[in-house]
Amino acid sequence: MKVRASVKKLCRNCKIVKRDGVIRVICSAEPKHKQRQG
């Protein structure tokens, strides 16, 4: 999980979701693409 000021989709499988007020990127194809804004 990378913590970044700016989260972006890194591939076409990445999805942007908002959980508890935190924007996250989840990716089914490449777990290394997981990100959290903070």
Swiss-Prot record:
Query: What role does it play?
Result: One of the last ribosomal proteins to be assembled in the 50S subunit, it contacts a number of helices in the 23S rRNA, acting as molecular glue. The simultaneous presence of uL16 and bL36 probably triggers ObgE's GTPase activity and eventual dissociation from the mature 50S ribosomal subunit.
Give the protein family: Belongs to the bacterial ribosomal protein bL36 family.
Q: Which Pfam families match?
A: Ribosomal_L36
One GO cellular component this record assigns the protein to is: cytoplasm
Species: Escherichia coli (strain K12)
Arranged from A to Z, the UniProt key words for this protein are: Ribonucleoprotein, Ribosomal protein, RNA-binding, rRNA-binding
Q: Does the keyword rRNA-binding apply?
A: yes
Supply the PROSITE patterns for this chain. Answer: RIBOSOMAL_L36 (PS00828)
Signal peptide (from-to): none
Gene behind this protein: rpmJ
Assembly behavior: Part of the 50S ribosomal subunit.
Show the HAMAP family listed in the entry: Ribosomal_bL36
GO MF assignments: rRNA binding; structural constituent of ribosome
State what protein this is by name. Answer: Large ribosomal subunit protein bL36A
**Gene Ontology biological process terms in this record:** cytoplasmic translation; translation
Known SUPFAM superfamilies for this protein?
A: Ribosomal protein L36
